[in-house]
């Protein structure tokens, strides 16, 4: 996970049930600046080509249809009905084309940018949203009017508010939820009195910004109703518990004070690691064992097992995490939350024995989509006392039928 992970780490630690944590997202982006491509595709009507100047996506559809089935990939029907081909499948075509040696992938901007208005829109799009992309093009002499910029696929992201559905297993709204998916208050987690929204809530993809703040409003109203119903009465936190939490939170700073004079060179210390060292270690671990960008998003049960073992060893080392100031203390806790999130992601990826989202990740030992056994939601719970995970399947209910 490349976000701070705190929305997930706090809940996992508390023993909340989580869902769809294997459903990470990989995004097609302009290379190095990571500017989004959607506005260019939709507004400027640009399109992609391989390094030879060829259309490449369609050549991968037959292979992909073998993997996922015609129900999920039917280019002819998509053309007739304007139903878009899923993002992950388009990613797969891009990844496969590069791995076949016909990269890089280019966004064809030279045609659209001949129109002065569209050229202005193209630049303003990034100057208003992803300034780094516009600056990078200027700094590297890339003019989209005269040169088609390169695209790439991103590292995996774990989030519940964009196109994927990672997050907590929450109660749905009373009016549309099946009985077992509603337990009194909309967006309440499986922990009594704990509510979530946006990234924190699982199984609700495509919320984006507007959906997230709308969900936040729904969640806040439900939490107020919970309080009005008297459910929050009698909650007492003792001074002893408060002091225990303070000690836990400030432990990295205390550890630094004790061992700060034992640095042998640079940041090397035999008695602690700092947040940056831990972050680099976690990134490398997840990238290599849980289907990261450098391995073309490929993993398998053996790799995931090794990853879980290394995460366990890292958890022991996080006991010696040090923070020199409040900023590093923030980074230290972000790292611990990322680590817990990474563990949950790895557990879920191992549990789902299929490749449900080719282009987001691949289970090399189970490369096909398997609706017979895995058209389900995955649900986990980490026991706060033992650290052990319990995994289960939950049914998917199609509340909106095809064609509605």
Task: Give residue ranges: language-model regions.
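Catalytic phosphate/nucleotide-handling subdomain of diverse soluble enzymes
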Residues: 185, 189-253
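Glycine-rich loop(s) and the adjacent beta-strand/alpha-helix scaffold that form part
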Residues: 1-36, 209-222
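Long, amphipathic alpha-helical stalk/connector segments used for oligomerization, subunit docking
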Residues: 228-324
